[in-house]
């Protein structure tokens, strides 16, 4: 048993060495950071149990990473250490207890806390205030000379500002790529047909390690200082945080979220606050770094083989994890779009257990090169739908199966088609397709459409399965007696649905248009159509040229609208609904008594609203004349930011867009 465990330890070492090279040298990691951290923790646990098995080449005895041969090597005068990790409050408390136990006479209560940036660690050497050398961390002892590349980073001062700086000082920090810059860089790459970067860290590392510094100069890199190495000429403050402030006076940027806090509970509060605002920050982070602030205590605590005893990285729950792709199911939406859905071995990621992930379309499957049975990297960040971001092809065993996109609808077996220039494959069956019929009816009765109370998804599915309804108009022919044949449907519930259907007959032209499910016609577009044309008849007979005069309607949407109303079966559906008694007041009357202070304004909602739903807020803003969009641009006039607002708020701040709160919104309404 002991022999097999020692053999497993050797295999674990080899795996960690391999993945360290992929991460640090090739900038092309195969596994998520969380998986690497788990493997390292397992290695260290075995070594703690069997210290006689520890070897000098163990990953636990060094930082990790190898210097590239293509750059001149630099030896660090003081090793650039990595950090140990904590993944829970208990592990954080253990770290602090160990430090206090080593120095029982010291009162360890002040901590310098900062976000853990996801970039590349670098060392900047200044002599007489002038930048003379920049180097990567490398293996902690030897790094690569990247001076010419670092000189291109605007936030790195080539000469220190102010006065009183040491004759020689080494400043350590992180080179990273802000989210906005990363998105722009990838947008340019896509337009050129070039390979895009997987994440900002890879983009930063790849940019910094260019042999041609002219290429680096075109990349949107930034730098934040986080510590000091060699210092000659003067003595710096004995407070880590005060050293930050001194560096800032000399022109070296520090992360604005960095704080000096007192006590364990304040450290936990800092962690919780940064975790809550993670998606809103303009850069990628994967945790927070907690350092004992007193430099004297730091020096006395010292370090272990690969990390200081006075600092720790408190990591966030992983946003990426490894799991197995067990199968792929193909779902059909209301417009016939066929979407491949990955069925995964359940995995806890981003704070929830994930068992399904979108694969988007056939192009995405081909791009990933993914197969059933593969080990895949799954990502879930914030409220984003989980998705597969890469495949660990090195873990293939040979029994994986290719994913075959269907040539006929998986529900109705109609022929599938893919229009040139579109990524989506669609079922051609229309309402003949039971799946499309279900989704079309769910959309028709949804809150933003006809808003039929009590007519939920399960009821719709039963109605279609039992062939009780085929088109939206059929819903209005249902009686309470007929509805009681459905599962869990008593006479009272059935009558409530009939009553709700009768109430829903009185609607607005905008809601009616939206309920029809015309491709690309959302709430805002439907409202614009209603305001512009005033009547259903005018919209039905509008030409392509007339449609593109409507705000928010371009060539593609105009084609979808004309095609919809030109289709004979759609004409019959609309006519049947009118015959069932659906009515709306003249459009002119809707806004005649409502002031429109936001007429012509482009508005964006972001964050969590506590007093009203996002849908209600959007509808109310549109009634006030606003055009509500989903993204922030130079054309945006106002951003209404709720709690935990994310990247949209950050972008608005960068563009100088007017920002208002939920209270401002409520006052306006």
From Swiss-Prot:
Keywords from the UniProt entry: DNA damage, DNA repair, DNA replication, Ligase, Magnesium, Manganese, Metal-binding, NAD, Zinc
Segments crossing the lipid bilayer: none
Record-listed Zn(2+) binding positions: 409, 412, 427, 433
Names of the cofactor(s): Mg(2+); Mn(2+)
Gene: ligA
GO molecular function, one term: DNA ligase (NAD+) activity
GO CC term, one of those recorded: cytosol
InterPro entries, per the entry: BRCT_dom, BRCT_dom_sf, DisA/LigA_HHH, DNA_ligase, DNA_ligase_AS, DNA_ligase_CS, DNAligase_adenylation, DNAligase_N
Domain of life assignment: Bacteria
Cited SMART domains: BRCT, HhH1, LIGANc
Name the UniProt record assigns to this protein: DNA ligase
Native source species: Vibrio vulnificus (strain YJ016)
Family as reported in the entry's similarity comment: Belongs to the NAD-dependent DNA ligase family. LigA subfamily.
Top-rank EC class of the record's enzyme: ligase
Binding site for NAD(+): 33-37, 82-83, 114, 137, 174, 291, 315
Entry's EC annotation: 6.5.1.2
Protein purpose: DNA ligase that catalyzes the formation of phosphodiester linkages between 5'-phosphoryl and 3'-hydroxyl groups in double-stranded DNA using NAD as a coenzyme and as the energy source for the reaction. It is essential for DNA replication and repair of damaged DNA.
The reaction(s) this protein catalyses: NAD(+) + (deoxyribonucleotide)n-3'-hydroxyl + 5'-phospho-(deoxyribonucleotide)m = (deoxyribonucleotide)n+m + AMP + beta-nicotinamide D-nucleotide
GO biological process terms on file: DNA repair; DNA replication
């Amino acid at each position: 048993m002991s022999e097999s465990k020692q053999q497993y330890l050797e295999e674990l070492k080899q795996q960690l060495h391999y993945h360290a090279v992929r991460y640090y040298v090739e900038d092309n990691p195969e596994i998520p950071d969380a998986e690497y951290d788990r493997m390292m923790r397992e290695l260290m646990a075995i070594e703690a149990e069997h210290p006689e098995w520890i070897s000098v080449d163990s990953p636990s005895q060094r930082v990790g990473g190898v210097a590239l041969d293509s750059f001149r090597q630099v030896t660090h005068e003081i090793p650039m250490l990595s950090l140990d990790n904590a993944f829970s409050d208990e592990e954080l408390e253990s770290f602090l207890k160990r430090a206090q136990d080593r120095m029982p006479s010291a009162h360890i209560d002040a901590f310098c806390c900062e976000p853990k940036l996801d970039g590349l660690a670098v060392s900047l050497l200044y002599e007489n205030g002038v930048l003379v050398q920049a180097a990567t961390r490398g293996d902690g002892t030897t790094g690569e000379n990247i001076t010419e590349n670092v000189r291109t980073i605007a936030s790195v001062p080539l000469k220190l500002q102010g006065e009183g700086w040491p004759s020689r000082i080494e400043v350590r920090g992180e080179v990273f790529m802000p989210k906005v810059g990363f998105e722009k860089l990838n947008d340019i790459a896509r337009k050129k047909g070039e390979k895009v970067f997987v994440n900002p860290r890879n983009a930063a590392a790849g940019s910094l390690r260019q042999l041609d510094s002219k290429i680096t100069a075109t990349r949107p890199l930034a730098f934040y200082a986080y510590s000091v190495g060699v210092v000659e000429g003067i003595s710096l403050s004995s407070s880590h945080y005060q050293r930050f402030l001194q560096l800032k006076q000399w022109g070296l940027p520090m992360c604005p979220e960095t704080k000096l806090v007192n006590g364990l509970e304040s450290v936990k509060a800092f962690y919780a606050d940064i975790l809550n605002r993670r998606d809103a920050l303009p850069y990628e982070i994967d945790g927070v770094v907690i350092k004992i602030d007193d430099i004297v205590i730091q020096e006395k605590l010292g370090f272990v083989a690969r990390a200081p005893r006075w600092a720790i990285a408190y990591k966030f729950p992983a946003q990426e994890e490894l799991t197995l792709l067990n199968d792929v199911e193909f779902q059909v939406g209301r417009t016939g779009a066929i979407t491949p859905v990955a069925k995964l071995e359940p995995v806890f990621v981003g704070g929830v257990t994930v068992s399904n992930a979108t694969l988007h379309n056939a192009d995405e499957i081909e791009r990933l090169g993914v197969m059933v049975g593969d080990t895949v990297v799954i990502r879930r960040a914030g409220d984003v739908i989980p998705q597969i971001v890469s495949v660990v092809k090195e873990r293939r065993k040979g029994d994986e199966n290719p994913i075959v996109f269907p040539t006929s609808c998986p529900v109705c077996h109609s022929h599938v088609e893919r229009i040139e220039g579109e990524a989506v494959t669609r079922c051609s069956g229309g309402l003949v397709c039971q799946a499309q019929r279900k989704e079309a009816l769910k959309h028709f009765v949804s809150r933003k459409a006809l808003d039929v109370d009590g007519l939920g998804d399960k009821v719709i599915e039963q109605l279609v399965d039992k062939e009780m309804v085929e088109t939206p108009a059929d819903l209005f022919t249902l009686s309470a007696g007929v509805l009681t044949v459905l599962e869990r449907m008593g006479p009272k519930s059935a009558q409530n649905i009939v009553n709700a259907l009768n109430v829903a007959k009185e609607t607005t032209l905008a809601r009616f248009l939206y309920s029809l499910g015309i491709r690309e016609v959302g709430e805002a577009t439907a409202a614009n159509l209603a305001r512009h044309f005033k009547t259903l008849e005018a919209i039905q007979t509008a030409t392509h040229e007339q449609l593109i005069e409507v705000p928010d309607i371009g060539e593609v949407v105009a084609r979808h609208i004309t095609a919809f109303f030109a289709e004979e079966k759609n004409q019959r559906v609309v006519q049947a609904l009118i015959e069932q008694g659906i009515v709306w007041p003249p459009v002119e009357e809707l806004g005649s008594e409502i002031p429109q202070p936001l007429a012509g304004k482009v508005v964006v909602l972001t964050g969590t609203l506590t007093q009203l739903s996002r849908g209600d807020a959007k509808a109310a803003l549109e009634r006030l004349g606003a055009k509500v969009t989903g993204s922030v641009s130079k054309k945006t006039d106002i951003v209404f930011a709720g709690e935990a607002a994310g990247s949209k708020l950050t972008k608005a701040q960068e563009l100088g867009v007017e920002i208002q709160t939920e209270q401002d919104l409520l006052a306006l309404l």
